[in-house]
Amino acid sequence: MKIIRKVEFKPGSYEEELPGISAEFPYIASYVELDKCAGRQSPWHWHKEAELFYMEQGSLEYDTPHGKAVFTAGSGGFVNSNVLHMSRAKEGEGSVAALLHIFNPLLISGQSGSIIDRKYVSPL
């Protein structure tokens, strides 16, 4: 599991560079120490992959163009592919850490356009 302390972008874009993810193995797991990131935040970014996360320590504010949500230790969330998002450690928090699972949505839908994809994955 890779420890993340900053977001790396593809040149000229807000698309996150995700080393290690490929068509052969469309999944990566990482441990994000948000309190050790510059500005205690992960800047606005997006990726083609879906993201499932679990808050291990502390709490953070998660932003998308559609709104904000606060996640505390023991809670988690899901961000679908191609969704612009950012997160920041809540004020007054010490350690803020999350476990991230980033994967191609086809891993759970089977194939693009399948009933599982149309009914349960794409609408998220």
Question: What is each stretch, according to the model?
Answer:
Residues 1-63, 67-70, 76:
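Generic protein-terminus/edge-of-domain signal
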Residues 2-10, 17-24, 84-124:
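A hydrophobic/aromatic-rich effector-binding and dimerization subdomain
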Residues 37-39, 73-74, 82, 104-106:
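Tight coil/turn sites that cap or link beta-strands
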Residues 59-61, 68, 77, 81-90, ...:
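Histidine-centered metal-chelating micro-motifs
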